[in-house]
């Protein structure tokens, strides 16, 4: 078997359906649209979500909840990520410089997934309980930034 004589399996590559090209093709005359009716006319396309007059799914389901416009969103970082950085002190500016924190939404929360081996001082807006315990266990400091 060579690259020059490879063949696709039967029915793998099907021909495109060419409509309106004579009765012999099987798709002539009405071009698979049937006779009369809205769907047979040109430019007919039902709107997205239309289910033939039945109440559509997006209207059958109830509305739930609301969007809180005062929600504060934090960028979260785990201790495992901090351990990879090999730094002794991590300030907010250091996180921004390394591309881990966005300048526009500069709120940072440290989570406790992972382990630390060296003592580090971390400045952040929030710490989870487990993160704070793990940082202080190895002799580091978790400093809250206002």
Curated annotation (Swiss-Prot):
Compositionally biased intervals (Low complexity): 40-49
One GO BP: translation
Stretches for region Disordered: 1-58
Extent of Basic residues compositional bias: 8-20, 30-39
SUPFAM superfamilies in UniProt: Ribosomal proteins L15p and L18e
Gene Ontology terms: cellular component: cytosolic large ribosomal subunit
Pfam family, one: Ribosomal_L27A
UniProt GO MF annotations: rRNA binding; structural constituent of ribosome
PROSITE patterns: RIBOSOMAL_L15
Keyword Glycosyltransferase: no
Keywords: Ribonucleoprotein, Ribosomal protein, RNA-binding, rRNA-binding
Record family assignment: Belongs to the universal ribosomal protein uL15 family.
PANTHER family: 50S RIBOSOMAL PROTEIN L15, LARGE RIBOSOMAL SUBUNIT PROTEIN UL15M
Function of the molecule: Binds to the 23S rRNA.
Oligomer status and interactors: Part of the 50S ribosomal subunit.
Protein name as catalogued: Large ribosomal subunit protein uL15
């Amino acid at each position: 078997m060579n690259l020059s004589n490879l063949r696709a399996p039967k029915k793998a590559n099907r021909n495109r359906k060419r409509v309106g090209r004579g009765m012999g093709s099987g798709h002539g005359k009405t071009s698979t649209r049937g006779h009369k009716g809205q769907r047979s006319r040109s430019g007919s396309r039902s709107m997205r979500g239309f289910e033939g007059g039945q109440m559509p799914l997006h209207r059958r389901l109830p509305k739930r909840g609301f969007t809180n416009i005062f929600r504060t969103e934090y960028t979260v970082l785990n201790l495992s990520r901090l351990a990879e950085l090999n730094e002794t002190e991590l300030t907010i500016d250091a996180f921004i410089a390394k591309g881990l924190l966005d300048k526009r939404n500069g709120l940072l929360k440290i989570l406790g997934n992972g382990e630390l081996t060296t003592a580090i001082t971390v400045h952040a807006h929030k710490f989870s309980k487990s993160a704070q315990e793990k940082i202080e266990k190895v002799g580091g400091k978790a400093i809250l930034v206002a």
